[in-house]
Amino acid sequence: MKKKLLVVINNRANYARIKSVLIEASKSKKLNLICVIASSGMLDKYGNVEKMMIKDGLNVSHKIYTIVEGENPTTMAKSTALLIMELSSIFSKEKPDIVFTVADRHETIATAIAGSYMNILVAHSQGGEVTGSIDENVRHAITKFSSIHLTSLEEYSKRIIQMGEDPSTV
């Protein structure tokens, strides 16, 4: 039986980082790829990701509009809360084996929180990185919510292990 891999794509940059992974996963005989586009990834003014994915031959299973206008801490918190609610409904319906999320934005932590509370394995890429911005705190929190850690450098892997994560999951 195929494993269900649900990937949440939140913006154009996240899509660009994992496009090749998505294309290969869509061809896999072992995986059933479920793509969810959310947040700014749905908006034309930020480069509508759905159009890019369709052009690349990928299916979009779910679309979520959750951006609360304002681009300030209050609206980011509200957008995060909306996305947790919407993703929880999708996760309940789809029953994925693994949820994959990218980077460190408020949408990423929403994915990690929803998956963790629903006892779904959460795979996170780009953990362990250090930037000095608020995103760093969010990224480290996402790491703690995640079950599988995909890093780009050995230095980042070591940092995740120093945070107390099991080395076999990094």
Label the model's feature ranges.
Residues 1-41:
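N-terminal subdomain of nucleotide-sugar transferases
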Residues 8, 36, 101-103, 125:
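Structural motif
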Residues 11, 104, 152-154:
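Helix N-cap/beta->alpha junction signal
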Residues 33-79, 86:
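Conserved nucleotide-sugar phosphate-binding/catalytic loop shared by glycosyltransferases and other
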Residues 89-105:
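Short N-terminal targeting/anchoring amphipathic segment
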Residues 100-117:
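An aromatic- and histidine-rich active-site surface loop
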Residues 120-170:
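Active-site-proximal region of nucleotide-activated glycan assembly enzymes
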